[in-house]
Amino acid sequence: MLLLKHGRIEILDQNTMYGWYELPKQEFLNSEQPEPITHSIKKFPLMKDVNPLENQKYACLMK
């Protein structure tokens, strides 16, 4: 998620709302847009379609 605050663009993790990168607004607006990552997304199954108890490959380890 992008957040504009004090003339800067901040990219936030939508789950934690933790900001991890900031750009001056004008630098962000002048930059080239990144390539879409739709080609990479198809390589990974949706978690709703995977039962982690049946397939340990997709299980998340709890710390």
UniProtKB/Swiss-Prot annotation:
Subcellular compartments: Plastid, Chloroplast
This protein's encoding gene: ycf15
Main subcellular location: plastid
Family of this protein: Belongs to the ycf15 family.
Highest taxon of source: Eukaryota
GO cellular component, one term: chloroplast
This protein's UniProt keywords: Chloroplast, Plastid
Xref: InterPro entries: Uncharacterised_Ycf15
Stated name of the protein: Putative uncharacterized protein ycf15
Pfam families according to UniProt: Ycf15
